[in-house]
């Protein structure tokens, strides 16, 4: 049995079914190219019979992808198979993926056919697909609820007909790991020609067991895993491929298998798909979540700084994440504070760690999360100065008209002086407000992230805006909170401007100290 596990990605087919709006041809191509770069073996790019748009997407992607095998879905219908073959005809090598339900429930209530009819339909469709390609996969839909006798019977017939890959889907996410493992083991024990085909599994996550089921299937002999990046898909989603891939890599000692994946491309691919599909990745998502390599507990931070292996089972750069993330909160210890001071270039005798840590805890209790520039200010300035705000928004007004233009007027207090400015833009009221503010302060900043989160429900709910900007090769954060989205956006930018100003004052004081 091969020690290589084939990774079959269905983000563009099964994953897209979870989206509120279909992806454009250009967006699908961008995702497909990212998957190819990541080393995905099989990319299921669509269901071409479903719509002219899907046909065009499959056709376009087939012309561009060279290093991954293209695959399209088809029912056991001659026209489906013909259209799938035509859509991929420009590809040098492709797969047709046929499916048909095999469980008693589906046969009786959905298809209204007996099992002999199901076998005849399946075998006949495989023979038609083989006219277009020698790579045919067959999925026994709802296989996990199909009787073992029927499943063994149809699998044997399909392999005899020429199917190279037999897929065993847990279509409704009903199975638990030992059950799926037993199904795979039974197929190997009872189907005499089973070794002429690769056994695949396609698990859904309705009970949160998609990854666990897939791992158990590998241990039982399955050598293809189907899923999606970030686990997107109908209902509770599909097997998260990045989790399967890294489980195989990290626990190769137990599983004894490997993949063809370029691991350093995992994080980038995950981010691209999240952005294109407009599906944010939960912070606590395994492997690719923002907290996957973040540490907030003082004990954990100290342990990671001494040796990453204390609290990390894989190195962040393995999947393309640049560095470990230590969140500075009231739970952080001295080790994390010292780590950031060292990172900024300060030496131990530049500050008193006990005084700094005491001031840090008070600020962390107040702010929640502290950033490196906050620490720097605490180390240089007094507690009184730490709370000083140089910029204060005294007034703002926004007007948007039907031609798409927005005009913002702001009155900004800068120290003891007050300035008024206005700006008109076609990019919306938030951009107009930011441009008006920048006319006053004239900081060459670049907005890198803008995130709006509703705090509560209804018309009186608060909107929290979190922004991240780049100024002179350094990142600064800002948070604004108000019932009015424009106001919370403006306050977030004011927060950023004060953080930048505070950093500038630190630099000035450091320059003065160097003179003596």
Curated annotation (Swiss-Prot):
Gene3D superfamilies attached to this UniProt entry: 1.10.238.260, 3.30.160.270, Aldolase class I
Pyruvate carboxyltransferase domain span: 5-267
Pathway assigned to this chain's UniProt record: Amino-acid biosynthesis; L-leucine biosynthesis; L-leucine from 3-methyl-2-oxobutanoate: step 1/4
Residues bound to Mn(2+): 14, 202, 204, 238
Family annotation (Pfam families): HCS_D2 (PF22617), HMGL-like (PF00682), LeuA_dimer (PF08502)
Entry EC no(s): 2.3.3.13
GO CC, alphabetical: cytosol
Catalytic activity reported: 3-methyl-2-oxobutanoate + acetyl-CoA + H2O = (2S)-2-isopropylmalate + CoA + H(+)
Spans through the membrane: none
One Gene Ontology term of the molecular function aspect: acetyl-CoA C-acetyltransferase activity
Required cofactor(s): Mn(2+)
UniProt GO BP: L-leucine biosynthetic process
Location(s), subcellular: Cytoplasm
Keywords: Amino-acid biosynthesis, Branched-chain amino acid biosynthesis, Cytoplasm, Leucine biosynthesis, Manganese, Metal-binding, Plasmid, Transferase
Annotated function: Catalyzes the condensation of the acetyl group of acetyl-CoA with 3-methyl-2-oxobutanoate (2-ketoisovalerate) to form 3-carboxy-3-hydroxy-4-methylpentanoate (2-isopropylmalate).
UniProt similarity note: Belongs to the alpha-IPM synthase/homocitrate synthase family. LeuA type 1 subfamily.
Name of protein: 2-isopropylmalate synthase
Species this protein is from: Buchnera aphidicola subsp. Diuraphis noxia
Gene designation: leuA
